[in-house]
Amino acid sequence: MSIAGDRTVAPWLDDSQFPFVSKFANVDGGRMHYVDDGQGEPVIFVHGFPTWSFMWRGLIRDLSTKHRCIAMDHIGFGLSDKPARWSYTPEAHARNFKKLLDHIGLSTFSLVVHDFGGPIALSYAIDNPGRINRICVVNSFLWSLKNDTSFQKFDHRMHGPMGKLALTATNTGLSHLVHGMVEQKQKVAGKVYPQYTGPFSKASDRHGAHVLAQGYIGSSTWLYDLWVRRESLAQKPLQVLWGMKDKLFSADHLNKWRAAWPNADVVTFPESGSLVMEEQAKEVEAAMYMFLDGHSELQSTTKALHAEF
């Protein structure tokens, strides 16, 4: 165990922004970093591409007054190990997610997922529905994207030489991706962005992100199977928080969640991109807080409030 912000471990890390104690679990590929803060009903936050547990810092700070907040970094991301030779597919990350849960030893918990964190974490939930209390989905998915035009174009870039060069040769490509995930640039302080790209300072550190980016289409068979088996989660309380100006996950993807979970609590943010927790921090925290506490009678008010933003 070490303190997050130790400059000998991650000299780029600003511990004033990420002031949490770091913990580690041994999983396939090396040491997986996670934070475990607060007491109460457990909530596990699962990031996707190309982010890490830093994205949840505000929610951890605010929700940990009533919840045990756990946020992990996939192998190859954040403060976790980044081995040169490892699979880095979403299926491999999903297996490691199970290893982390075995390490922590929770009986039941709620999930908050973003981007690829959806299928990575919900694959476990589908197989273990009795351990899941609630699910909050933030601009994420749980199905094959092989027929999705936007993701086909993205996948073509990621498999092409220029896409690989842009993502792995320097940190500039990932920096552009992160900036593109934010629509309302004025709402995110400049000091935040280097914390997202810091884990990828070396070329060798960016390999895992590149492989995962190829999984949107490359893991279509696995993703298709997850969607087919989603019925085990049909009765779970589900909240969907959606930045409507996401460059990849559109209103069509949001509507797929709505159709599959007609009773879901859906809160949209018309002017926000994928990193809605950065752009609408207070509003996201308020909506998630009420949902995790089961205050469904307040959720319609929350939706009306958010319609103003």
Segment roles from a protein language model:
Residues 36-79:
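Conserved HGGG/HGGXW glycine-rich cap/lid loop of the alpha/beta-hydrolase fold
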Residues 272-285:
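Catalytic histidine-centered segment of alpha/beta-hydrolase-like enzymes
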Residues 146-211:
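Helix-rich cap/lid subdomain of alpha/beta-hydrolase
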Residues 204-259, 268:
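Conserved serine/cysteine hydrolase catalytic core
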Residues 55-57, 80-86, 146-148, 251-252:
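Conserved catalytic-core motifs of eukaryotic protein kinase domains, centered on the activation segment
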Residues 1-43, 64-67, 102, 106-108, ...:
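Alpha/beta-hydrolase fold catalytic core
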Residues 107-149:
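Conserved hydrolase catalytic core segment
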Residues 27-29, 35-37, 71-114, 286:
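Active-site loop/oxyanion-hole signature of alpha/beta-hydrolase fold enzymes
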